Amino acid sequence: MEAEQTRAVTGKQVLLTGATNGIGLAAAEALAARGANVAIVARDRQRAEQAAARARAAATAAGVESVVDVLLADLSLQSEVRRLALEVADRYEKLDVLANNAGAIFATRQLTADGVERSWALNHLAPFLLTALLMDKLRASAPARVITTSSDASRGAHIPFDDLDGERSYGQGSRLGRGFPRYGETKLANIVFTAELARRVQGSGVSAYCFHPGLVATGFNRNNGPLMKLGMSVVRPFSRSPRKGAETLVWLAESPSVLGQEGGYFFDLKPRQVPPGATEAGVGPRLWEVSEKQVSASAFGSG
């Protein structure tokens, strides 16, 4: 990592979703190498155990102690998010950092068992619900941080309040595939969620940040067919390494310099201007309200 290693996360408990490949795996390794205790959340046990082994090896190579656990959950399903939150609350005395990193692009429109479009469920509602369910634990562990992986794919997007199921979004398509407009909407939701979360938990000792990792060559698009793979192959020569993409996540987890910038959007260790869709009048409270309805939960009061 190019950022200065402050070791501020030594002994801290981190919950990291989407950590079996790409920037999530790179972040798990970097955090473990700084002495953080990392709980990796994944769907597949074998891949999760492989990721955990790499994180433990990184800690050993750095000469530090790190406890790396594996937790299993399909975050596109609300029942699984709820079960995970209960397990985390019961298993860990504290939670210092929640890193909502899991995400995906889907080439075709799919509905989950909850009746929610799958990319919206995984990329937005899962972080929203998991954060809500773990907020008491985060507050009790304060100072604590919530970090959500967003993307500049959000630029040009708007929150589709009249198209939450993505029918119109998937009808648009793009040169990179039909799923990219929808992906951009979910990543915009991450930015709006972070800003609204920061506003609602202000003064609680819990800080919220989100970031753009840059164009990273990862495997999160592996199951989307030949057209999507072709689109990604076009941009791959311009991509950065997962390690570089994870740098800002790790920095947000440990740096004291981000205090006072709660709710912010970052890229390469610097604040980044949010896309216009994130500043539309009333977008934060409105997204919060519809998200509560979609997960059937009241999150942190009405604000």
Give the ranges of each region predicted by the language model:
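Rossmann-fold NAD(P)H-dependent dehydrogenase/reductase core
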Residues: 1-219, 298-301
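C-terminal helix-and-tail extensions that cap enzymatic domains
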Residues: 29, 264-303
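Pocket-edge positions in alpha/beta enzyme catalytic cores
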Residues: 40, 73, 237, 276-279
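Alpha-helical elements of Rossmann-like donor-binding domains used by nucleotide-donor carbohydrate transfer enzymes
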Residues: 83, 87, 129, 248-251, ...
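Short glycine/proline- and charge-enriched loop/turn segments
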Residues: 163-175, 224-233, 269-272
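C-terminal helical subdomain
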Residues: 186, 210, 232-272, 281-286
